[in-house]
Amino acid sequence: MRNQSSLFVTAMLLGAVGLGACGTTPAEDRDRLTFPARQDFPVGVRGADTLSPGSRTYTFNPGLENSHLFVQIFSASLGHDHVVRATDWYGSIRFDPAKLEGCAISVTVSVEGLDPERDEMRDLMGQDRVSRSDRDQIREHLRGEDQLDLAKYDTIQFTSRSCELSSERGAGGYAQVVVHGDMTLRGSTREVSLPLEVAVDEERVAARGVLTARHQDFGFEPYSMLGGLFKNKDELYFVMDVRGERVPGK
């Protein structure tokens, strides 16, 4: 009986308590995505076209205030929605304002550093907090062989191929760049596109956008339990709301 009870509790946590985004479409789910730092996004100028010519490199810094990278996963059935914050990651962006299509962006995320259901993230999303022991249990399943499989694959990577300036501006009115590149997850690499709203000056950069991927594109199924009574949706929303600083001399 204890094992059955434990199984049910785990299902409630991973699929978890409430109706979440059950019945919503991917478009509706995207409207529910959370950007932590909407109010502080501006850093000084309106876009890359205002900068002096020449290549420059910025490094994204997870240690900077309001620099967040996380994954949102919505429930497909009974259960709550999940937020998984990346606590160990790094990335960079290099571009020349006169040759934006030649930009180079890379981001590497440590799977071991993915921390689910942190208090500040659940507060941000307006969801009830999860106990420490329950978070640990969710983290264990997230790293499991049927999910991210940490034992075999310790990083998630994105590397750009090209960039293009969009005719549309982002939600904050800043220039939007569509970054085409390759994403590697669980050892599988797929071509993806990442629309990024970018504010930048000579010393700092802020970028925010959502990369949408699907479990099945990378060879695994969304977490499911009790015959699908508790199940996550196929879509994985990698939310970037990040800050960076220019590399001295570059």
List where the protein language model places each region.
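Low-complexity, acidic/polar, glycine-enriched regions of mature
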Residues: 22-250
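Bacterial N-terminal signal peptides
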Residues: 10-20
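Bacterial N-terminal signal peptides that target proteins for export
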Residues: 1-9
